Curated annotation (Swiss-Prot):
Name assigned to this protein: Cytochrome b559 subunit alpha
Keywords in alphabetical order: Chloroplast, Electron transport, Heme, Iron, Membrane, Metal-binding, Photosynthesis, Photosystem II, Plastid, Thylakoid, Transmembrane, Transmembrane helix, Transport
PANTHER family xref list: CYTOCHROME B559 SUBUNIT BETA-RELATED
Comment on bound cofactor: With its partner (PsbF) binds heme. PSII binds additional chlorophylls, carotenoids and specific lipids.
Role of this protein: This b-type cytochrome is tightly associated with the reaction center of photosystem II (PSII). PSII is a light-driven water:plastoquinone oxidoreductase that uses light energy to abstract electrons from H(2)O, generating O(2) and a proton gradient subsequently used for ATP formation. It consists of a core antenna complex that captures photons, and an electron transfer chain that converts photonic excitation into a charge separation.
Gene giving rise to this polypeptide: psbE
Similarity field: Belongs to the PsbE/PsbF family.
GO molecular function, one term: electron transfer activity
Native species: Cyanidium caldarium
Amino acid sequence: MSGGSTGERPFSDIITSVRYWVIHSITIPSLFIAGWLFVSTGLAYDVFGTPRPNEYFSENRQQVPLINDRFNAREELDDLTSNL
């Protein structure tokens, strides 16, 4: 059996059609604007639970919270989070 048609439209026909560009001239900029608003309004910080740039360091603790001893990590973690 030779390679026959799958019944799908060729990609070149799709991207040269007016219908494709009418739909995508609206959806592509809309997705870009939605993503920009998602990040610029700070909603991305809330959804993913990441701290905002001004929340990385508290007033009491200005050093980077590093764990130095892996065998006593629980104690170091408790010390680092006790001021939060």
